[in-house]
Amino acid sequence: MELTEEITNEANGKRLSMKLSVIIVNYNVKYYVDQCIRSVLRALPPVMPAEIIVVDNHSGDGSVEYLSARYPKAEYPMLRIISSERNLGFARANNIAIRQSKGEYVLLLNPDTIVGEHVLEESIRFMDAHQDGGALGVKMLGVEGNAAMESRRGLPSPLVAFYKMMGFCRRWPKSRVFGHYYMGYLPWDEPAQIEVVSGAYCLLRKAALDKVGLLDEDFFMYGEDIDLSYRVLKGGYHNYYLPVSILHYKGESTEKSSFRYVHVFYEAMLIFFRKHYSGMSLFFSFPIKVAIYAKASVALMGMMSERVRKSLGFFVKGDVRPQRFVFVGTQGMLDACREIADKFCLEAEYVKLGAEESGAEGSMTESLGADCLEDLKVEAESDKLCNVVFDADAISYEAMLDWMQRNPRKLVQLGTYCQALGKIIVCRDVLG
């Protein structure tokens, strides 16, 4: 069966095979997934035949109708929306799209991410040059500009998992023995072979998927990326880390303070353990299982205590943290954000940058590069969250991410505004 679709390149009349299929599973985060799609459209090279497949997991926020209106088929023929009648979970929803995909490569991408303008091109170029590569991950940044440890992970063998759950990984992060779970001994700015690629950005060679199989649907939401990465390695491929940056809000699709989250997360650990290490002796397996159940119990008790404390009216510093907003962009963006700030009574500052207004959707008549933010200074406050909201119509996503990486500070977080959405998007909040 042919896995690639022939497409005509209008520039030279040649027939090109579908190179990339981007798959995004959405659940109740329509503005975040819209922002994600916009970043993907910017990052797709014009000469690269590609498709974007969004699987909506029965969202209740009108995501399907919203995205269908924002991206009409006539204007965006490369984008397809698959609407599920129930929440299928991450693995099953991705598998539906993978089966329909036509690309040489498949990119699994979280909806709460932003990709830099050259990330896709560099990722594909690296995989083309490394035919032994089955999967590739990138440097994921949190909203405060710090690199996420989940960007490079080792396989959670019983011993590695035990070291992590006992805190040894945190105590000795650069140790090749105790710190193997996050592979903290690897440099951040160099490509490297890793063992586990995060499902938030996982570029897969379609041929590797054909060989090792799709995501295991026994995993509802967590652990499927670890399982797939392990099977890719066992299939004779290597998994790679590439130091190009994306933003990962990390959890906008998930309420991590819920009892259901704890159950699903730790159940995934047990599924992986039973699947790949079921033959291990009781002497070794029992401590691991005890540690998993203990961690889950501690997490549940902590959440119960937190809910009881809040229900009784007891709050500690940080429960409700004041915020300020620093808007950085062109005059048109600042005027629009001023209206929103006045509407929501936000404490706001405004920094004007010189740039022309944006052009067509997904493009900019003048994109400000990283040097446009060289002189941007934002003061951090110890008791107040600062949202630095960038003009996404005038400033490249790469420039935003570069500034955040150069200025990582606690309580200083990245936000965006674009005219087409008319919304201020920050971590865990959308205003407009």
List the predicted regions and their residue ranges:
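Short, well-formed alpha-helical segments that are part of the catalytic scaffolds
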Residues: 29-44
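A conserved acidic beta->alpha catalytic loop
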Residues: 39, 56-65, 86
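Glycine-rich, basic loop-to-helix element that forms the pyrophosphate-binding segment
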Residues: 81-101, 122
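Short aromatic/hydrophobic "clamp" motif used to bind/position activated sugar donors
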Residues: 106
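Conserved donor NDP-sugar-binding/catalytic core segment of glycosyltransferases
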Residues: 114-150
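Short, flexible, basic/aromatic active-site loop/helix in glycosyltransferases
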Residues: 155-194
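A short, conserved alpha-helix in the catalytic core of glycosyltransferases
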Residues: 187-190, 195-245, 403-404
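Active-site-adjacent helix/loop segment of glycosyltransferases
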Residues: 230-308
